[in-house]
Amino acid sequence: VIEQKRLFFIDAIRAWAIIMMLQGHFIDGLLDPIYRNTDNNIYNIWLYFRGITAPVFFTASGLIFTYLLFKETDKSYRNKRLKKGLIRAGQLLLLGYLLRLNINGLFKGEIYPSSYYVDVLHCIGIALFCIIVLYYLIGKWSYWGFALVAVLISVIVFIFEPLYINLTLDSWPIFLSHYISKAHGSVFTIIPWLGYSTFGAFLALLLLKFKSFHKFYPVAILICILGGYLLKYESSDFFIWVRDTIEWPLLKNVAAKNYLFMRLGDVLWVLAIFMGLRNAVTHPRILAIGQNTLSIYVIHSVLLYGSSYNFGLYRFFKQSLTPTEAISGSIVFVTISVLLSFLYVHSQNWRSQIFSRIFAKK
């Protein structure tokens, strides 16, 4: 029981992140542009939390998967986790494309360009696959080797962002270019977001290694607070100092637009908050939200964007709501999405019985 409780705050983080993602998508898509005023402190606070949601979500995804993978040393257990991870990665990729597939276009014999856009599900699926590959290459043989390479991937992906952020990859097949470049319409790309997932994998191994130490949580919270501060407020000056020391011009660009490392600082602060609240976020409903983020995400996509049939709220209320309407609407929207997810999960046994009867051997 004690071992399981140490994961409660991770599920709580995932619950918070998916709720923030849902309300962010709702308000961003339906709020009238005339109310998007950066001179308004309330709007700026909302904008800040919207900005940290994706980094937190990607980090938590890498953290929980790696934690469960390395939790036991038994070979059969790990093989089971790896198989489950591969299936989930494939499921995420498939769902990512299905949610963007336009049925009306298919009836016309067309596949619209937006059907190939890469979104958050694609990126998490690829991130899980990369973590699995990293496990087979290094993790099977070296615990700390895996951790070191994982955090190095994060640092490299973030530092070299100025070199790939504006790539168009026009010579690539459009299907593949969407994974690297936003030039043709993708919402997310593998890089730099992979860096947050591998950083989560790194944190998972630290958690597993040191969680049994005396005063682990107070020390971990302090480290996250200090680390977050350094990343948010000191990392730009650090990159400038390194650039001047070794004369590496790239670091000037990193320091000028240092959002990736600064968001990583935000991630550490969120971790610190939830570790501090670990004994207060153990309600079964909170944990259930964190454990069912995929179904919640899919349901919200269908309700808000209409997904494959293009008949969602976005079609009727696109950028037309007042702040009061957007805020109250987002509360209702999040509540309905979560409740429908719970209904879907609770009907699993019933659905399994129906399918088993349909496909039962006569």
Regions found by a protein language model. Give the residues of each.
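Alpha-helical transmembrane segments and their immediate juxtamembrane cytosolic regions
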Residues: 1-362
